[in-house]
Amino acid sequence: DLASGDTVLIPYVNRLISAFWAESFRTEGFDARVLENSERILHTGYRHANGGECMPAVAIAGGAIELIRSQKLEPSSTFLYLPAVCMACNFPQFPVMASMATESAGLKGLKVGRVNFLNPGAVLPGMLGMRLFETSVIASLIYKLYHRIRPYEREDGAADRALGDAEGIVLRALRDREGMRKAFGRVAELFRGIERDDAERRPRVAVLGDMYVKYNEVVNQQVTRRIEDLGGEIVLPS
């Protein structure tokens, strides 16, 4: 179980969700570190997997192995936050696979959090579980705004700057324990202020998949950027 003084490893989902999750743990006094997002961690993961697992599960395991080794963390006081929910795929098996892969890498004793995303209070302290859920929703909404506006921006880079500013707004709100609704109101104003030309809508393309794929530019091989380059507008279901 998660204990005071543990180092918490945060899976890389995307730039926003992972940063918000890490900051949520930090506000509760934990040392939280986001796993690397690169092809290298995929190679590491596959060295300690059976080969038939979902790519996101392999990426998470590889990221945990690389971070523990590179930062010389003690597995017994390291907690891998790995939320799951019972659904018709291998999602609930991610924690099992991560435990097996890290043990194969010689990192026995790593705490792999089997956290039900819909009932996190059994594992996580206080309101932390609710904050993690809330920030996941906020991050998803920010990306919806971002992908809705970026293809139509009049000034190149305006949506990217707004995305960076939005990240800062939510991180500060977490540190100050401010309500997320108020923070998101300021984020919405940022994107509302971007000048755009959307009189003629582009073809809309939905990107489906679990959250470790549809947002992750390494695992999905930058599919969202490619769609926009080809003249489409991204729709990311939450």
Describe each model-derived feature in a short phrase.
Residues D1-S238:
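An N-terminal assembly and electron-transfer interface module characteristic of large anaerobic redox
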